[in-house]
C-alpha cells in the first residue's frame, strides 16, 4: 500500500506470465496480440510475435535449427579449429594458452551451436551467425559524425562476415577514430584513449550478444564529438524497465551511451 495525494492506494504488480503470447482469443494469435510501447498499445510486429512464441516454449532463436543451411563433418572440424585458434590468439599468457582444449562436435552440441535429431547433426542459427552464413546475415554499421548530432556525416564503415569478426572490426574502427592522449607514470609516458577501451569492447560485445536476431535491422555504432552511441535491434529484456535500469539493474540493455570527458 502507498499514500498518493493523501490517499491510500493499493499497488498491484503483475509479473509476465510464462505461456506467452497472450492474445484476444476472438481475433486469433496473429491479429489479437498487442504490446505496450512508450505508453501506447500497439499491434505486435511479426518478429516480436515469433520471439514471444519462442519464449513461451522456453526456446531460443540461436538454438533453433537453421533450415536453410547444411553442414558436413569437414565444415564442423574446420569451425572447431578456428574457435581454438581464436581462443589462443586472444590469450596473452603462455600458461593460459596451454590450458585451452580442443573444441569438438559434442562440445558444439552441448553449447547449442549444433543440434542432433534422429542421429543427424544440424547447424543452428548460432552456427550460421558464427560462420557468417546466415541468410541475410546482419552487419555492424559504424558512422562518424561531426558535432553532437547526425547532421554532419564524416565517415562510414560496414562490417560483414561472422559476428565475432564483425565485433572485433567495429572495436578496432572505434579505436582508430577516437582521440588518444597521454599520461606520465613515474619516468614513463603511457598512451591513453579518450574512452576506456574495455568499456568500448564490452558495449559492442553486449550489442552483438543481446540483440534480437529476429528483428530486421543492424547494430549501429555512432561516434559523435562528445559521446559514443551503440544501438542494437530489439526490445528490453523481460522484467527490465527504464526505472530499473536507472537503479542499476544488472541485466544488459539494448541501447547505451558512453560520454566523453570534457575539458575546460
Where are these regions (language model features)?
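Conserved N-terminal catalytic/coupling substructures associated with nucleotide/phosphate chemistry
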Residues: 1-260, 264
Amino acid at each position: 500500500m502507498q499514500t498518493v495525494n493523501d490517499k491510500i492506494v493499493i499497488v498491484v504488480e503483475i509479473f509476465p506470465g510464462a505461456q506467452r503470447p497472450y492474445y484476444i482469443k476472438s481475433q486469433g494469435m496473429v491479429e489479437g496480440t498487442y504490446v505496450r510501447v512508450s505508453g501506447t498499445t500497439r499491434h505486435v510486429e511479426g518478429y516480436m510475435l515469433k520471439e514471444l512464441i519462442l519464449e513461451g516454449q522456453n526456446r531460443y532463436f540461436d538454438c533453433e535449427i537453421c533450415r536453410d543451411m547444411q553442414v558436413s563433418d569437414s565444415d564442423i572440424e574446420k569451425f572447431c579449429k578456428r574457435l581454438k585458434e581464436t581462443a589462443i590468439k586472444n590469450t596473452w599468457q603462455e600458461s593460459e594458452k596451454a590450458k585451452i582444449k580442443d573444441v569438438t562436435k559434442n562440445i558444439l552440441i552441448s553449447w547449442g551451436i549444433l543440434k542432433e535429431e534422429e542421429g543427424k547433426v544440424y547447424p543452428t542459427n548460432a552456427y550460421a551467425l558464427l560462420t557468417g552464413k546466415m541468410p541475410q546475415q546482419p552487419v555492424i554499421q559504424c558512422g562518424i559524425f561531426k558535432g553532437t548530432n547526425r547532421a554532419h556525416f564524416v565517415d562510414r564503415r560496414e562490417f560483414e562476415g561472422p559476428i565475432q569478426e564483425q565485433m572485433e572490426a567495429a572495436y578496432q574502427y572505434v579505436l582508430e577514430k577516437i582521440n588518444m592522449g597521454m599520461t606520465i607514470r613515474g619516468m614513463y609516458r603511457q598512451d591513453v584513449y579518450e574512452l576506456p577501451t574495455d568499456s568500448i569492447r564490452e558495449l559492442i560485445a553486449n550489442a552483438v550478444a543481446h540483440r534480437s536476431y529476429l528483428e530486421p535491422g543492424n547494430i549501429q555504432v555512432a561516434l559523435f564529438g562528445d559521446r559514443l552511441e551503440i544501438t542494437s535491434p530489439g526490445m528490453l529484456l523481460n522484467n527490465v524497465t527504464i526505472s530499473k535500469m536507472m537503479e542499476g539493474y544488472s541485466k544488459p540493455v539494448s541501447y547505451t551511451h558512453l560520454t566523453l570527458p570534457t575539458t575546460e
